[in-house]
UniProtKB/Swiss-Prot annotation:
It comes from Alkaliphilus metalliredigens (strain QYMF). Pfam families: DUF188. Belongs to the UPF0178 family. InterPro entries: UPF0178. It comes from the Bacteria. This is UPF0178 protein Amet_2995.
């Protein structure tokens, strides 16, 4: 399993760096050239053009069944689920086949309202509880999936 980060607006990169290093997991950060930063030497970093969907296309090309993708992009999440990979939001909520339809519907309705001049409430300001919820969800997921993969290897 590898962990792939949609890094253009990911507020939990440092948490991911630490946890993936602790579990010795392959970590890939994908972001546009507009979001380059220092301090990403320990992980594989893929920098794409600053074009619409360039990072999403690269993420889809690199994702395999069983991988974990971190993104807040509902459209990308739907595509990743189609590859039988797992998707976790930076708020610690998993996108699943059971909830993706309603999330896509909400995204569509919000976009429609904005195009008609309406206002759509954005996400709340991020706080430490959000980081904690994300870290707990990630650790729980990894504990379960790494344990299952080691059982399968021992069979």
């Amino acid at each position: 399993m590898k962990v792939i980060i949609d890094g253009d607006a990911c507020p939990v990169k440092n948490i991911l760096f630490n946890i993936c290093e602790h579990h010795d997991l392959e970590l890939i950060l994908v972001h546009s050239i507009a979001h380059m930063s220092k301090g990403e030497q320990k992980i594989e970093t893929i920098i794409v053009d600053n074009e619409a969907e360039a990072a999403d296309i690269m993420i889809m090309n690199r994702t395999k069944a069983g991988d974990l993708v971190i993104t807040a992009d509902t459209g990308l999440a739907a595509l990743v689920l189609g590859k039988r990979a797992f998707v976790l939001s930076p708020w610690g909520h998993f996108y699943t086949n059971d909830n993706i339809g309603s999330l896509l519907d909400r995204r569509y309705l919000n976009r429609k309202m904005m195009l008609q001049g309406g206002r759509v409430k954005g996400p709340k300001k991020r706080n430490k509880e959000d980081d904690h919820r994300f870290q707990q969800a990630l650790e729980s997921f990894l504990e379960k999936h790494l344990r299952n993969s080691s059982k399968q290897e021992g069979v």
